[in-house]
Protein backbone atom coordinates (compact mmCIF):
# COMPACT_ATOMS: atom_id res chain seq x y z
CA UNK A 1 0.00 0.00 0.00
CA UNK A 2 1.39 3.37 -0.98
CA UNK A 3 2.01 6.00 1.66
CA UNK A 4 0.74 9.06 -0.18
CA UNK A 5 1.49 11.31 2.78
CA UNK A 6 5.10 10.23 2.59
CA UNK A 7 5.21 10.82 -1.15
CA UNK A 8 3.66 14.27 -0.65
CA UNK A 9 6.27 15.25 1.95
CA UNK A 10 9.22 14.11 -0.17
CA UNK A 11 7.85 15.80 -3.30
CA UNK A 12 7.23 19.04 -1.38
CA UNK A 13 10.78 19.18 -0.08
CA UNK A 14 12.07 18.52 -3.56
CA UNK A 15 9.89 21.26 -5.05
CA UNK A 16 11.35 23.83 -2.69
CA UNK A 17 14.66 23.46 -4.53
CA UNK A 18 13.34 22.58 -7.97
CA UNK A 19 10.34 24.50 -9.22
CA UNK A 20 9.89 22.08 -12.12
CA UNK A 21 8.92 19.34 -9.69
CA UNK A 22 5.72 21.20 -8.74
CA UNK A 23 3.90 19.46 -11.58
CA UNK A 24 5.01 16.09 -10.20
CA UNK A 25 3.72 17.07 -6.77
CA UNK A 26 0.34 18.08 -8.18
CA UNK A 27 0.13 14.87 -10.22
CA UNK A 28 0.93 12.64 -7.24
CA UNK A 29 -1.70 14.36 -5.09
CA UNK A 30 -4.28 14.07 -7.86
CA UNK A 31 -3.46 10.40 -8.33
CA UNK A 32 -4.21 9.73 -4.65
CA UNK A 33 -7.53 11.58 -4.86
CA UNK A 34 -9.00 9.69 -7.82
CA UNK A 35 -8.39 6.14 -6.64
CA UNK A 36 -10.26 4.01 -4.13
CA UNK A 37 -10.18 0.46 -2.80
CA UNK A 38 -13.03 -2.01 -2.76
CA UNK A 39 -13.63 -5.76 -2.86
CA UNK A 40 -14.20 -7.85 -5.97
CA UNK A 41 -16.69 -10.43 -4.69
CA UNK A 42 -18.48 -11.60 -1.53
CA UNK A 43 -16.36 -13.20 1.19
CA UNK A 44 -16.99 -14.70 4.62
CA UNK A 45 -15.32 -15.04 7.99
CA UNK A 46 -16.24 -16.80 11.23
CA UNK A 47 -15.28 -15.98 14.80
CA UNK A 48 -16.32 -17.85 17.94
CA UNK A 49 -16.12 -16.71 21.54
CA UNK A 50 -17.59 -18.46 24.59
CA UNK A 51 -19.89 -20.54 22.39
CA UNK A 52 -21.25 -17.47 20.58
CA UNK A 53 -20.75 -17.75 16.82
CA UNK A 54 -20.20 -14.67 14.67
CA UNK A 55 -20.63 -15.13 10.91
CA UNK A 56 -19.37 -12.18 8.86
CA UNK A 57 -20.15 -11.53 5.21
CA UNK A 58 -18.42 -8.80 3.17
CA UNK A 59 -20.25 -7.72 0.01
CA UNK A 60 -19.43 -5.28 -2.80
CA UNK A 61 -22.19 -2.66 -3.16
CA UNK A 62 -22.70 0.58 -5.05
CA UNK A 63 -25.96 2.01 -3.71
CA UNK A 64 -28.11 2.14 -0.59
CA UNK A 65 -30.73 0.15 -2.50
CA UNK A 66 -28.23 -2.69 -2.94
CA UNK A 67 -27.42 -2.52 0.77
CA UNK A 68 -31.10 -2.81 1.69
CA UNK A 69 -31.59 -5.75 -0.68
CA UNK A 70 -28.63 -7.65 0.80
CA UNK A 71 -29.78 -6.95 4.35
CA UNK A 72 -33.23 -8.30 3.58
CA UNK A 73 -31.71 -11.44 2.05
CA UNK A 74 -29.43 -12.20 4.98
CA UNK A 75 -32.01 -11.33 7.61
CA UNK A 76 -34.27 -13.96 6.03
CA UNK A 77 -31.43 -16.46 5.68
CA UNK A 78 -30.41 -16.09 9.34
CA UNK A 79 -33.91 -15.57 10.72
CA UNK A 80 -33.05 -17.61 13.81
CA UNK A 81 -29.98 -15.54 14.77
CA UNK A 82 -30.01 -13.27 17.82
CA UNK A 83 -28.53 -10.27 15.97
CA UNK A 84 -27.76 -9.28 12.36
CA UNK A 85 -25.50 -6.22 12.63
CA UNK A 86 -23.83 -4.33 9.82
CA UNK A 87 -21.89 -1.36 8.52
CA UNK A 88 -21.36 0.02 5.04
CA UNK A 89 -19.33 2.64 3.20
CA UNK A 90 -20.22 4.07 -0.23
CA UNK A 91 -18.62 6.38 -2.79
CA UNK A 92 -15.01 7.09 -3.69
CA UNK A 93 -14.99 10.04 -1.26
CA UNK A 94 -16.10 7.68 1.54
CA UNK A 95 -18.70 10.10 2.91
CA UNK A 96 -21.80 7.88 2.78
CA UNK A 97 -21.69 5.35 5.61
CA UNK A 98 -23.75 3.80 8.37
CA UNK A 99 -23.31 1.40 11.29
CA UNK A 100 -26.11 -0.56 12.97
CA UNK A 101 -25.99 -2.50 16.26
CA UNK A 102 -29.32 -4.33 15.71
CA UNK A 103 -30.13 -4.63 19.39
CA UNK A 104 -26.62 -5.07 20.74
CA UNK A 105 -25.44 -2.47 23.29
CA UNK A 106 -24.78 0.86 21.58
CA UNK A 107 -21.40 1.02 19.85
CA UNK A 108 -20.49 -2.65 20.39
CA UNK A 109 -21.30 -4.04 16.92
CA UNK A 110 -21.80 -1.63 14.04
CA UNK A 111 -19.00 0.70 15.07
CA UNK A 112 -16.26 -1.98 15.29
CA UNK A 113 -17.45 -3.39 11.95
CA UNK A 114 -17.18 0.07 10.40
CA UNK A 115 -13.79 0.44 12.04
CA UNK A 116 -12.49 -2.52 10.04
CA UNK A 117 -13.81 -1.03 6.82
CA UNK A 118 -12.01 2.22 7.66
CA UNK A 119 -8.76 0.58 8.74
CA UNK A 120 -8.60 -1.15 5.36
CA UNK A 121 -9.52 2.11 3.58
CA UNK A 122 -12.37 0.40 1.73
CA UNK A 123 -15.52 1.76 0.13
CA UNK A 124 -18.48 0.42 -1.84
CA UNK A 125 -18.67 -2.34 0.72
CA UNK A 126 -21.22 -3.78 3.14
CA UNK A 127 -20.15 -6.01 6.03
CA UNK A 128 -22.84 -7.99 7.85
CA UNK A 129 -22.10 -9.88 11.06
CA UNK A 130 -24.62 -12.45 12.26
CA UNK A 131 -24.48 -13.53 15.90
CA UNK A 132 -25.74 -16.80 17.31
CA UNK A 133 -25.81 -16.45 21.09
CA UNK A 134 -24.00 -19.23 22.95
CA UNK A 135 -25.59 -18.70 26.35
CA UNK A 136 -22.69 -16.81 27.91
CA UNK A 137 -22.68 -13.01 27.95
CA UNK A 138 -19.54 -11.45 26.51
CA UNK A 139 -19.83 -7.99 28.04
CA UNK A 140 -19.28 -4.72 26.22
CA UNK A 141 -15.56 -5.17 25.57
CA UNK A 142 -16.05 -8.79 24.55
CA UNK A 143 -18.70 -7.85 22.00
CA UNK A 144 -16.50 -5.14 20.51
CA UNK A 145 -13.61 -7.58 20.12
CA UNK A 146 -15.86 -10.26 18.62
CA UNK A 147 -17.56 -8.06 16.02
CA UNK A 148 -14.25 -6.48 15.10
CA UNK A 149 -12.58 -9.88 14.70
CA UNK A 150 -15.42 -11.33 12.64
CA UNK A 151 -15.44 -8.35 10.27
CA UNK A 152 -11.66 -8.53 9.98
CA UNK A 153 -11.89 -12.22 9.01
CA UNK A 154 -14.38 -11.52 6.22
CA UNK A 155 -12.32 -8.63 4.83
CA UNK A 156 -9.10 -10.65 5.05
CA UNK A 157 -10.75 -13.35 2.94
CA UNK A 158 -11.76 -10.84 0.24
CA UNK A 159 -9.84 -9.85 -2.86
CA UNK A 160 -9.18 -6.12 -2.61
CA UNK A 161 -8.61 -4.05 -5.74
CA UNK A 162 -7.82 -0.42 -6.43
CA UNK A 163 -10.11 1.38 -8.87
CA UNK A 164 -9.88 4.79 -10.49
CA UNK A 165 -12.48 7.53 -10.60
CA UNK A 166 -13.14 8.17 -14.28
CA UNK A 167 -14.75 11.02 -16.21
CA UNK A 168 -16.31 11.10 -19.68
CA UNK A 169 -16.23 13.85 -22.29
CA UNK A 170 -18.24 14.16 -25.52
CA UNK A 171 -17.29 16.41 -28.42
CA UNK A 172 -17.97 17.13 -32.10
CA UNK A 173 -15.49 17.89 -34.87
CA UNK A 174 -15.32 18.00 -38.65
CA UNK A 175 -14.11 14.90 -40.48
CA UNK A 176 -10.99 16.49 -42.07
CA UNK A 177 -9.54 16.84 -38.55
CA UNK A 178 -9.97 13.15 -37.69
CA UNK A 179 -6.21 12.50 -37.72
CA UNK A 180 -5.62 15.27 -35.19
CA UNK A 181 -8.22 13.82 -32.84
CA UNK A 182 -6.96 10.25 -33.20
CA UNK A 183 -3.39 11.39 -32.50
CA UNK A 184 -4.53 12.75 -29.14
CA UNK A 185 -6.51 9.57 -28.44
CA UNK A 186 -3.53 7.37 -29.27
CA UNK A 187 -1.13 9.33 -27.07
CA UNK A 188 -3.42 9.96 -24.07
CA UNK A 189 -5.04 6.48 -24.23
CA UNK A 190 -8.60 7.22 -23.09
CA UNK A 191 -11.31 4.61 -23.54
CA UNK A 192 -13.54 5.26 -26.56
CA UNK A 193 -17.13 4.85 -25.40
CA UNK A 194 -18.89 6.05 -28.52
CA UNK A 195 -17.95 7.28 -31.98
CA UNK A 196 -19.79 8.21 -35.16
CA UNK A 197 -18.20 9.50 -38.35
CA UNK A 198 -19.80 11.83 -40.87
CA UNK A 199 -19.05 15.34 -42.01
CA UNK A 200 -19.72 16.19 -38.37
CA UNK A 201 -18.08 13.51 -36.23
CA UNK A 202 -19.04 12.78 -32.64
CA UNK A 203 -16.96 10.98 -30.00
CA UNK A 204 -17.23 10.17 -26.30
CA UNK A 205 -14.09 9.33 -24.33
CA UNK A 206 -13.53 8.20 -20.76
CA UNK A 207 -10.32 8.67 -18.80
CA UNK A 208 -9.03 8.82 -15.25
CA UNK A 209 -10.21 11.97 -13.46
CA UNK A 210 -6.72 13.32 -12.82
CA UNK A 211 -5.86 12.98 -16.52
CA UNK A 212 -8.97 14.70 -17.87
CA UNK A 213 -7.62 18.30 -17.75
CA UNK A 214 -4.68 17.36 -19.99
CA UNK A 215 -6.92 15.47 -22.40
CA UNK A 216 -9.37 18.37 -22.71
CA UNK A 217 -6.53 20.87 -23.13
CA UNK A 218 -5.12 18.89 -26.05
CA UNK A 219 -8.52 18.39 -27.67
CA UNK A 220 -9.26 22.11 -27.43
CA UNK A 221 -6.37 22.74 -29.82
CA UNK A 222 -7.99 20.68 -32.58
CA UNK A 223 -9.65 22.94 -35.16
CA UNK A 224 -13.47 22.84 -35.33
CA UNK A 225 -13.68 20.70 -32.17
CA UNK A 226 -16.38 21.70 -29.70
CA UNK A 227 -17.48 20.02 -26.49
CA UNK A 228 -21.06 19.08 -25.77
Each language-model region and where it sits:
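C-terminal regulatory domains involved in ligand/effector binding and gene-expression control
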Residues: 31-107, 194, 221
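Short glycine-/aliphatic-rich beta-strand segments at the starts of folded cytosolic domains
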Residues: 160-175
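Short amphipathic alpha-helix segments
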Residues: 173-189
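Short amphipathic alpha-helices in soluble, non-transmembrane regions
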Residues: 184-186, 215-223
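Terminal, non-globular segments
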Residues: 205, 211-214
